[in-house]
Amino acid sequence: MKCKVYTVVVPNVQSATLLPIIREKVKPDSIVYTDTFRSYDVLDVSEFSHFRINHSTHFAENHNYINGIGNFWNHAKRHLQKFNGIPKEHFELYLKECEWRFNNSEIKSQISILKQLVKGSLV
């Protein structure tokens, strides 16, 4: 199964900020794999089955990986470097473009979607 990402710029990375976003995007009773970042501790007492992957001790324990997000960030950084800097007020739009490109990684799919968007805007 191909990893899909959802990106959003947040004012901080505290649990109180992250949990509502996670609840909005992830179905209850889903299995959620995270790294050991402290803000994810709240997931232990949430409606999700939460499992932590400690990169330094168990990179792929029981075949459960979180490297999909690492893969996304590698793609995003490579794409964003081409611009030699991005205005802060437009960063979220550039990030959303990276999300779209990652979630629709096949060029044929991207072209098809873009054609549909162009046709829709001409009507």
From Swiss-Prot:
Keywords assigned by UniProt, alphabetized: DNA recombination, Transposable element, Transposition
InterPro entries: IS1016-like_transposase, Tnp_ISXO2-like
Ranges in coiled-coil conformation: none
Any one of the GO BP annotations: DNA recombination
Pfam families: DDE_Tnp_IS1595 (PF12762)
Record PANTHER family: DDE_TNP_IS1595 DOMAIN-CONTAINING PROTEIN, SI:DKEY-17M8.2
Similarity comment: family membership: To insertion element IS1016 transposase.
Designated name of the protein: Uncharacterized transposase-like protein HI_1328.1
Biological source species: Haemophilus influenzae (strain ATCC 51907 / DSM 11121 / KW20 / Rd)
